[in-house]
Amino acid sequence: MSCTTAPSPGWPGWGGPTGDFKVKSRGLANSWSGKGPRQLWNRELGDGYSGILVDGNRLYTLYLDGETEVVVALEATTGKTLWKHTYPAAIKKNPDNTARKYGLGPQATPLLTKGYVVAIGWNGDMYCLKKSTGEVVWFHSLSQEFNSPVLSRGYSPSPLAYKGLILCLVGGQGHSFMAFDVEDGRVIWSKHNFKRSHSSPILINVDGQDQLIGMMDQEILGVNPSNGDLLWSHTHGLAGDLTISTPLGGQDGLVFISTAYTGGSRALQLTRSNGQTSVQELWFTKKMRVHHGNMIRLGNLVYGSSGDFGPAFLTAIHVSTGVVAWKERLFAKATLIYADGKFIVLDEDGMLALARPSVEGLTVLAKAQILEHNCWTVPSLVGTTLYVRSRKKVLALDLK
């Protein structure tokens, strides 16, 4: 488990209840009819890639409507809108052609904590809202107040909750990482001068110490989540506008990172002695290059979809050695959830599948076309209900 906080029911933020895209659901089907799993409901939704949060009978996410961003609460059983909060979101920096092609909607996944939903839009507009009503509790413009760079593809890092704090990867002089009080938005700490990337940070525990891990423009680094003190840093060397995937932590102190384009994958071994954290790079390879999808570690294997805008291969790699166990060209570029001994795979073309992973390869149990291109958002699973979105729609599916 990569997250150091207690698991939450539902799907409270990026990575789900434990922050590692693993869910303790049981009773998932091993096969579907030709039409795929039973659809409970579907509805139109505006542009964006923000994940869907689940809390009881409510869902929360963000989307773009014209030049307005919307934080919305939906009824989980019907998809009906319960409340929405809107705010102007005219793009403040000219996006590049890739961003225009693939949409200008919000990308960061919001966060549920202590009765609030915290959401960050394309321009770095951060709202804390009451989850029951959508009433604004506090607001910060990360770009205007703290000079967070608005990259050519917008703001992407998802926030984290930690002991009453909201932790954000902000970037800029003195603001690489920031911590805000969840109740009133006060800045608790703000430190470092590293430029940010699109990657979301994670929380891990290294030999008894909680650490906040973030992929920056050129470095991956760890800080103390309570005060922001720098614990360690290590160069990864790919420009921040191309660094997107989230680091993957483990209880053994291994941190796995991967980037696409000219990047690759590497494993770092973190150890603590005499109050200091040391970092050792175990290996580097270009044989696995995860773009913007997520990765999942099961035992000694890390699984992810390798490739950027060309062919994609679902890949398994030994985290301790960097040796590729297998590559399968079964899907377009894809995201993953692990539950009930199976992967739920959603590729960017809208193909949904159940597949059983092993060290030898991937056994596909069922697959069905459920949406159109492009589906880059990791689905959310609570019980046997899967919530899936594209740039146009959101679906609820029964996987039992």
Q: Can you annotate each of these PLM segments?
A:
Residues 72, 127, 178, 221-222, ...:
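WD40 beta-propeller blade core
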Residues 56-57, 114-115, 163-164, 208-210, ...:
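Short coil/turn segments that connect the beta-strands within blades of beta-propeller domains
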Residues 16-19, 64-66, 122, 171-172, ...:
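Short loop/turn segments immediately following the C-termini of beta-strands
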Residues 75-78, 130-133, 181-184, 224-227, ...:
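Short loop/turn segments that connect beta-strands within beta-propeller blades
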Residues 40-53, 84-111, 139-161, 171-174, ...:
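Extracytoplasmic beta-rich repeat domains
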Residues 7-38, 266-268:
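Blade/loop signatures of beta-propeller domains
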Residues 350, 374-400:
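Blade-level signature of beta-propeller repeat domains, shared across WD40, Kelch, NHL, RCC1
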